[in-house]
Amino acid sequence: MADAGKKKLVQQEELRRLMKAKQRRSCSKKRIESPLAKYNSLGHLLCVVCNIQIKSELLWPAHILGKQHKEKVAELKGSKANISSPSNKVQLHHIMKRKGSEPENQESKRIKGTEDQPTALKTKLPEGFFETEETSSAKHAAEKAPSLKLLAGDYEDDDEVEGEEYENVNEASTSLQKPAEIPLPPPTSSADRLPADFFESKMPLVSHSGSVLKADIQEKIVERKDNTAEALPEGFFDDPEADAKVRKVDAPKDQMDKEWEEFQKEIRQVNSVSDAIVAEEDEEGRLDRQIDEIDEQIECYRRVEHLRDLKDTLQDAKMEVLKSKSSKKWQEEIGSDDEETLPSLLYKNWRDKGAFL
């Protein structure tokens, strides 16, 4: 018996150990792989956005679809957008700086290029390069001029920059056309001849004038003010009226008055409904009482008619009895009169008798 008990204990311990191992394996398989999920040292699942511990991996989809998680994500996105988008004033300041420094860099680069061109032409320049260079440089200058006008806002400086660029382009084209008689290798692809960012301008394009930019800045400032007023929590200020004014909410007294009026309105509605129900019940009760009274009157009329019928039958029976009694009495009276007259006739004299006969 002792051996059997030990075997059972051993089997239970093995089963428990196997169940725990199975649970661990299932937990390890169900680990959440998400940038918003994180596991601590104890292996508990945490939400990075909400900073909340999730009890189980099965609850992770429900937590992601929850209202609190979505609000936190939206707040983070809004703050990130506000941080990543600099003000237009800073952009214009950088643009003005770049505008002053770019012509100098371009002039230095062009001077260096003209000095190194006699050696480079022997190996790199293909046939027809000068025509393509002139057309591409003219197009690039024509595309760059309006962008500089929009970015800077100073039209006189833009005209000077355009004039310098056109003069530099003409000088470069004339200097390149002189050694055109040198034998050149076969033409190569345009990707080898031009740099990768030749047609791209690193300066951001502005699609509106300065006045429109100022209006956009003012709108953004107003929106941010509204967002800050809405973001303030309830009770941020000690004075409840000031707190309600900043948060653009009704004051506590006004709110209490509104709630009291709503309460009174609801009470009146409930009272009107209850009065209507009571009136309906009273009307139904009155109709029921009238119906009962009518039924009772009908029953009383039936009883009266029945009693009348009984009275008539009794009267008829009484009349018959009286008639029978009167007829009997009359007959008795007639018989008694005959008996009395007979002896008187017998005792009369014969004369009278004969005369009588």
From Swiss-Prot:
Region described as Disordered: spans on this chain: 98-126, 157-194, 231-255
Q: Which UniProt keywords apply?
A: Cell cycle, Cell division, Chromosome, Coiled coil, Developmental protein, Metal-binding, Mitosis, Nucleus, Zinc, Zinc-finger
Q: Would you tell me the Gene Ontology cellular component terms?
A: chromosome; nuclear speck; spliceosomal complex
**Ranges of compositional bias, category Acidic residues:** 157-168
Q: Does the keyword Cell cycle apply?
A: yes
SMART domains xref list: ZnF_U1
Under SUPFAM superfamilies, the record lists: beta-beta-alpha zinc fingers (SSF57667)
Q: Please identify the protein, giving its name as recorded.
A: Zinc finger protein 830
Please report the organism this UniProt entry assigns to the protein.
Xenopus tropicalis
